[in-house]
A protein has these predicted regions:
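N-terminal hydrophobic segments of proteins, predominantly signal-anchor/transmembrane helices
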Residues: 1, 9-78, 370-373
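Hydrophobic core segments of transmembrane alpha-helices in multi-pass, intramembrane catalytic enzymes
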Residues: 8-18, 67-80, 153-169, 196-208, ...
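Alpha-helical transmembrane segments of multi-pass inner-membrane proteins
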Residues: 52, 95-127, 137-141, 147-212, ...
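A membrane-periplasm/extracellular boundary helix in multi-pass inner-membrane enzymes
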Residues: 109, 115-118, 192, 212-267, ...
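Long extracytoplasmic/lumenal interhelical loops at the membrane interface
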Residues: 139, 260-331
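Hydrophobic transmembrane alpha-helices and their immediate junctions
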Residues: 172-179, 202-211, 308-311, 330-372
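Transmembrane alpha-helices of multi-pass inner-membrane enzymes
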Residues: 205-206, 222, 342-345, 362-407
Length: 407
C-alpha cells in the first residue's frame, strides 16, 4: 500500500529548481570535487548506495519501498546536486541561510498563534484527498505547536535545525528582526513540548555559551537575563501562562528522571519517562532475526511486521519513535550502515572546520545543526528535508572556501 508519491509543495519547488538549472546553467556541473573537499564523497556514496539497494529489494512487492526510493533519489541525492548547481558562492550560501531563517520566523509566528487560539491554521492548506498526518495534539490543556509538519515532534526537529542557523544570522547581522526570529523559534520549539528536543537544545545552548567568544557570550547572557525578566513580569500578569511553562519544564524533568510523579491533564502519551524509546531498541533484534541485511521493509510498523520485546514478550507495535531504530528495522544493516556512515562523517568534517572563536565562520552553525539532528533522532523518527538543504549548503560553503584558499 501507500500509492504513488504525493505532489507536495516541496516537490513542486524541487521541480521548479530542476527546470531553472536546465534552462539557466545549460549543463550539470559535477560535484565530486566539492564532496571530496568536505570529506563526504564516500560517506554519501555509501549512504545512497546502501539505501537504494535496501529499498530496491522490496520495490517489486511493496509500493511504499518505491516511495522511499523516490525520496532518497529525488529529494535527497538530486536535491544536493541541484543546490550545488545554483548556489555558486559563499554570498549565495549566506543569502540562502538568511532566507531560510527569515521564513522560519513567519512559520513560528503562525505556530505560536495556533497555540494561543487552540487551532492549527495551516490545516486550511490541505488540498489532497489522501489522508495526511495532522495530529493536533493537546497536552496539558493547550494545543502543541506543529506548523505544517503534521506532528509536534517533526516541527521540533525543524526548530532544532533552524535555531543554530538563526543564531549565526543574529550574531553577524545585528538588528531587531534577527533577534525576534531567533527568539520566536526558541519559543516555538518550547511550545512543541517535544521533551527530547527541548533537552537537546538546552544542552547545546550550555555548550555553546562555554565555547563561544567572550563578546558573543556576553550578548547571549544579556539576552537570557532580558528574557528572564520578561518571563517574571508575564508570570505575575498572567499566572496561567507561568503555570503552563512550569508544567512543560516539569514534564521534561519527569521524562528524563526516575520520578514516578505524573502531571494532571497531561494528555497524549505518558508523562513519565522515555522508556518507550528504549524498548524500541529491541526492534533491531527482531529485524536481525527476520532479515538482517535488508530489514523488514519501508513502513514495516504500519504493516504489522514490527514487534518490540515488552515485559519479556514480543508484541506487535505500529510506532517508531527512534530515528536510528527506523533505519535499522526498515532497511536492515544496510540502512544502519548508511545512517551511521553519513552522520559520523558530517560531525567529523564540520567539527574540523568549525572555529567558535570566529563568529563569522558558518561552519560553527553547520556543526551545531548536525549535532542537534543526530541527538534529536534518538527521540524522533524523522528524515528532515531541511537537513539535506543544510548539507548541500555546507558542501558549497566549504568548496568555495577551498577555491579561494587555492587562488
Amino acid at each position: 500500500g501507500g500509492g504513488l508519491p504525493l505532489l507536495k509543495a516541496s516537490r513542486i519547488l524541487l521541480l521548479i529548481l530542476m527546470l531553472c538549472v536546465c534552462f539557466h546553467n545549460k549543463k550539470i556541473h559535477l560535484i565530486r570535487q566539492p564532496l571530496k573537499v568536505t570529506g563526504l564523497y564516500w560517506p554519501l556514496f555509501i549512504y545512497f548506495a546502501a539505501r537504494i539497494l535496501a529499498n530496491g529489494y522490496y520495490a517489486p512487492s511493496l509500493s511504499v519501498a518505491i516511495n522511499t526510493e523516490f525520496t532518497v533519489i529525488v529529494e535527497q541525492l538530486l536535491l544536493i546536486v541541484m543546490i550545488c548547481q545554483v548556489v555558486r558562492s559563499r554570498e549565495d550560501v549566506h543569502l540562502c541561510v538568511k532566507t531560510i531563517v527569515n521564513a522560519s520566523g513567519v512559520v513560528a509566528i503562525i505556530s505560536i498563534i495556533n497555540v494561543l487560539i487552540g487551532s492549527n491554521l495551516f490545516y486550511n492548506l490541505n488540498t489532497v484527498s489522501r489522508n495526511v498526518l495532522m495530529v493536533s495534539t493537546v497536552r496539558m490543556g493547550i494545543i502543541r505547536a506543529e506548523a505544517t509538519f503534521g506532528h509536534p515532534v517533526y516541527y521540533a526537529m525543524y526548530c532544532a535545525l533552524i535555531i543554530p542557523l538563526a543564531l549565526y544570522v543574529w550574531q553577524n547581522e545585528k538588528n531587531a528582526w534577527n533577534s525576534c526570529v531567533l527568539g520566536l523559534n526558541v519559543i516555538a520549539a518550547f511550545l512543541t513540548e517535544s521533551r527530547g528536543t527541548i533537552v537537546v537544545l538546552l544542552a547545546l545552548f550550555l555548550i555553546y555559551v562555554i565555547i563561544a567568544d567572550k563578546k558573543t557570550r556576553n550578548r547571549i547572557l544579556t539576552a537570557v537575563c532580558a528574557i528572564a525578566c520578561v518571563a517574571v513580569v508575564v508570570s505575575f500578569v498572567v499566572p496561567t501562562v507561568a503555570q503552563q511553562f512550569s508544567n512543560i519544564i516539569k514534564s521534561v524533568m519527569i521524562a528524563f528522571g526516575d520520578s514516578s510523579e505524573t502531571i494532571e491533564n497531561f494528555g497524549g502519551n505518558s508523562s513519565t519517562g522515555l522508556s518507550s524509546r528504549m524498548i524500541q531498541l529491541s526492534g533491531i533484534s527482531w529485524m536481525l532475526i527476520h532479515n538482517a541485511v535488508f530489514g523488514l521493509g519501508a513502513s514495516c510498523h504500519t504493516r504489522g511486521k514490527l514487534s518490540y520485546r515488552i515485559n519479556g514478550v514480543w508484541q506487535v507495535r505500529d510506532t517508531i519513535d527512534n530515528g536510528y531504530v527506523g533505519y535499522f528495522v526498515e532497511e536492515g544493516l544496510l540502512g544502519g550502515i548508511a545512517c551511521f556512515s553519513l552522520f559520523y562523517s558530517l560531525l567529523k568534517s564540520s567539527w574540523k572546520k568549525a572555529t567558535f572563536k570566529n563568529s563569522r565562520n558558518m561552519n560553527n552553525s553547520f556543526f551545531l545543526c548536525f549535532v542537534s539532528y543526530v541527538a534529536v533522532m534518538l527521540s524522533v523518527a524523522d528524515v528532515s528535508q531541511l537537513l539535506w538543504v543544510i548539507i548541500a549548503l555546507y558542501i558549497t560553503y566549504n568548496a568555495k572556501a577551498q577555491a579561494i584558499a587555492s587562488e
